[in-house]
Amino acid sequence: MFPFMLFSTLFSSIFTEPREKMWICNSSDASLWYNYCDDMKFPISVKVEPCVTIKGTKGKLHLYYIARRDIQKLYLNLHISIKSMTLPMRKEVICREYGGDYSFCGALKGETVNTTIPFSFQGIRFSPGQYHCVVEAISGNSEEMLFCLNFTIIHYSSLN
């Protein structure tokens, strides 16, 4: 009995389940999904229309979740890695202390955030490969984490 307990204690981390991946979409040249990179796993829905194509996409990002903190002074820490290269962390300010450009700036804890954000990266050329982007949403003077998501994009072809 003791060897079994010792074995299961020492090697339990090896046999744990990987974090669940949330599929977003597939396009002709890419697949996109995310998983949580924090332990809070607060339900967040992410949808992209149309699905991302690496040749250049202009579309809308739909984000739906219930705020677990007041959304004030919101910024995103972006950690991006491309193949084996990691880019310097980028900090994007989304909401300032007294408002911002987005309707969810100033939302209170428990309120539903249901927003659509336009995006475009036409003219940018991506090489085939796997891209990772960790998005940490930080809010308030105490810099509390709202959520952390780890996005993965796999670019299949070299059609760009």
Curated annotation (Swiss-Prot):
Where in or outside the cell? Secreted, Extracellular space; Secreted
Q: Which residues are glycosylated?
A: N26, N114, N150
Chief subcellular location: secreted
SUPFAM superfamilies found in the cross-reference section: E set domains
Keyword vocabulary terms for this entry: Disulfide bond, Glycoprotein, Immunity, Inflammatory response, Innate immunity, Secreted, Signal
Q: Name one GO cellular component term.
A: lipopolysaccharide receptor complex
- What Pfam families does this protein map onto? E1_DerP2_DerF2
The record's region (Interaction with lipopolysaccharide) falls at 119-123
Q: Known post-translational modifications?
A: N-glycosylated.
Signal peptide residues are 1-16
Q: SMART domains from the xrefs?
A: ML (SM00737)
Q: Mind listing the GO biological process terms from this record?
A: cellular response to lipopolysaccharide; detection of lipopolysaccharide; inflammatory response; innate immune response; lipopolysaccharide-mediated signaling pathway; positive regulation of lipopolysaccharide-mediated signaling pathway; positive regulation of tumor necrosis factor production; toll-like receptor 4 signaling pathway
Question: Is Disulfide bond one of the keywords?
Answer: yes
Q: Name one GO molecular function term.
A: lipopolysaccharide binding
Disulfides per UniProt: C25-C51, C37-C148, C95-C105
Function statement: Binds bacterial lipopolysaccharide (LPS). Cooperates with TLR4 in the innate immune response to bacterial lipopolysaccharide (LPS), and with TLR2 in the response to cell wall components from Gram-positive and Gram-negative bacteria. Enhances TLR4-dependent activation of NF-kappa-B. Cells expressing both LY96 and TLR4, but not TLR4 alone, respond to LPS.
What is the protein's quaternary organization? Heterogeneous homomer formed from homodimers; disulfide-linked. Belongs to the lipopolysaccharide (LPS) receptor, a multi-protein complex containing at least CD14, LY96 and TLR4. Binds to the extracellular domains of TLR2 and TLR4. Ligand binding induces interaction with TLR4 and oligomerization of the complex.
Name of the protein: Lymphocyte antigen 96
Species in which this protein is naturally found: Bos taurus (Bovine)
